[in-house]
Swiss-Prot record:
It is an enzyme of class 1 (oxidoreductase). This is Malate dehydrogenase. Catalyzes the reversible oxidation of malate to oxaloacetate. The keyword NADP does not apply. The active site is at 172 (proton acceptor). Its EC number is 1.1.1.37. Substrate binds at residues 82, 88, 120, 148. It comes from Sulfolobus acidocaldarius (strain ATCC 33909 / DSM 639 / JCM 8929 / NBRC 15157 / NCIMB 11770). The lineage of its organism: Archaea, Thermoproteota, Thermoprotei, Sulfolobales, Sulfolobaceae. NAD(+) binds at residues 8-13, 33, 95, 118-120. SUPFAM superfamilies: LDH C-terminal domain-like (SSF56327), NAD(P)-binding Rossmann-fold domains (SSF51735). The gene is mdh. Belongs to the LDH/MDH superfamily. InterPro entries: L-lactate/malate_DH, Lactate/malate_DH_C, Lactate/malate_DH_N, Lactate_DH/Glyco_Ohase_4_C, NAD(P)-bd_dom_sf.
Length: 306
């Protein structure tokens, strides 16, 4: 039996939860939000869809965090969303306070759960939650960027996206990078001779989210599908290789950073050895950059909550 809890059912949380539910592998899905009536009314919407889709999934909706109990997987989308003109990092203090509160409450009734962080800045929020809870925590990291990279190359070459392989690593955000030694087209190593410029791809991966937010008000459908794939790989122990952010020990902190890694009920091993030296060096630099920003933000956070 697989039980999945969603903490936060705003725009992104609803989309991920819907995709999870209609795929039918979760026996029970729990929906929590602080907004009165929001989980309940979302549950009604889902039930109306399930009646047509003939999917059998038990649903629980609540505004009481104590009702979230016995989950195998806890997906955290709760937090302030990114607005036009904002960096993901701008959300650190406000969302970190939410993560600390959740870290005190959720583990009590969800022993042994895998926590999947979605709230931004997603990698640092995973580190904050793990720091204050001690629980097994990953973030969805650069799985979404990975699909953006593949889809962009596929569109430029007029081929299906599933014929493009490879991963984006580093931080979900400013330090994201295409790991070019992993990228393939129709099973062969990527080459700019195909007519796709590397710098153009990197630029797209880093900037397209902000452009979507500017016009649509948020990114929804891409993350909704891409993040559900992470949940499914954990729930069904599929062992897919994905670019999610998992814990790395660096200096005096645990830092979450993305690189290709096997994802199932446990996360690992990482495929670091498959990267070329240039990609390894870029990842090392990304970890350092994220650590420095994280430490600076932690100091500010400690002043706010003390």
């Amino acid at each position: 039996m697989v039980k999945v809890a969603f903490i936060g059912v705003g725009r992104v949380g609803q989309t991920i939860a819907y995709n999870t539910i209609v795929n039918g592998y979760a026996d029970e899905v729990m929906l929590y939000d602080v907004v009165p009536e929001l989980p309940e009314k979302f549950e009604h919407e889902i039930r109306h869809a399930l009646a047509a889709l003939r999917v059998k999934t038990e649903l629980l909706s609540t505004n009481n965090i104590d009702d979230i109990s016995g989950a195998d997987i806890v997906v955290i989308t709760a937090g302030k969303p990114r607005k036009p003109g904002m960096s993901r990092r701008d959300l650190f203090i406000d969302n970190a306070k939410i993560m600390i509160d959740l870290a005190k409450k959720l583990p009590k009734k969800n022993k042994g759960a895998m926590y999947i962080m979605v709230a931004n800045p997603v990698d640092m929020m995973a580190s904050v939650f793990m720091k204050y809870s001690g629980e097994n925590t990953i973030s969805t990291g650069n799985q979404v960027e990975t699909m953006r990279m593949r889809s962009y190359i596929a569109k430029k070459l007029n081929i299906p996206a599933y014929e493009v392989g490879g991963y984006v690593g580093g931080e979900h955000g400013e330090a994201a990078m295409v790991l070019w030694s992993t990228v393939t087209v129709k099973g062969k190593p990527f080459s700019e001779s195909l007519g796709v410029n590397k710098a153009e791809v990197e630029d797209y991966v880093k900037k397209i989210a902000a452009e979507i937010i500017r016009v649509l008000g948020g990114t929804t459908w891409g993350p909704g599908a891409d993040i559900e794939e992470v949940i499914r790989s954990v729930a069904l122990n599929e062992g897919k290789v994905m670019s999610v952010a998992f814990p790395h020990k660096y200096e005096d902190e645990i830092i979450h950073i993305s690189e290709p890694v096997v994802v199932g009920r446990t996360v690992g091993p990482a495929l670091t050895s498959a990267l070329d030296e240039n990609d390894k060096a870029r990842l090392s630099q990304a970890i350092k950059e994220v650590y420095n920003v994280y430490k600076s933000n932690l100091k500010e956070l400690e002043q706010v909550i003390s």
